[in-house]
Amino acid sequence: RRSNYMKIKELGIDGKDVGNIEVSDNIFSLKPRKDIIKMVVDWQISRHSKKTGYTKTRGEVAGSRKKIGPQKGSGGARHGNITAPIFVGGGIAHGPKAKGKHRVKRLNKKVRKLGLKHALSSKVLDNKINILSDKDFKNFKTKDFSKFLSKINSKSALLIYDNENEVLLNNVKNIKNIKNIPEIGTNVYDILKYQNVLFTHSSIKKLQERLLK
C-alpha cells in the first residue's frame, strides 16, 4: 500500500514554527480503533504485572508418603512422612497462594505495530503530537523547556528522542510529569498516558521508517 503524507509543524524551543515535516497517513492518519489499542495496552500491562508467589503444601511436593519410623518405641519424636513442613524439601505451611498462574498474553508483532499506529493517529486527531527542532538542543536550559510546555498548553508530556543528547536529557529529567524514552522504546501505554507526545526531528523520521517496513 502506497503511503500518502500529511504535514506536522516543527517547533523551535521558543514555540515558534520552523517548518513542516511530512509524516505518513498510514501511521498518523488512521481512524483509531479502540479495540486494537486496548489489546496492545492489556498485553503491555500483562508483561509488567507483578508475579505473585505460589508455594507448595505437603500434599503437593514430591516425596514418599510412607511414615519414616514407628509411632512409638524409638525414643524420638513422632513423625509422619518426609513431606512435612519441618523437613528440608517438605511442603510449606501457610505460604502464599496465588489465585491461578500468571500468564503473559501473547500478541504478534504485526498487531503491536498496528496498535502503535492507531495510538499515534489518536494523538494527531487531538492535536497532541509536537515535533521539536533538534537545532536548539546544544544550549537550551530547563526553564526553556518549561516555557515551551506552557506555550503548547501541556501538563504532561512524553519526549521521544533518537540521538541521546546529554544536555537535553539532563534538563528534561528535572521537570515534573515528563518522561523521556528512546525512539525504539515508543509504546502505546506511554503514548496514551501523557497528554502530549513530543518527537525530535530525527526521532519521528526514524520511527516512521521503522513502522513502514
Predicted regions, residues:
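Extended polybasic, low-complexity segments that bind anionic RNA or targeting/receptor surfaces
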Residues: R1-K50, K97-K213
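Short, structured surface segments that line ligand/substrate-binding pockets
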Residues: K50-G53, G59
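Glycine/serine-rich anion-binding loops at beta->alpha junctions
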Residues: R58-G95
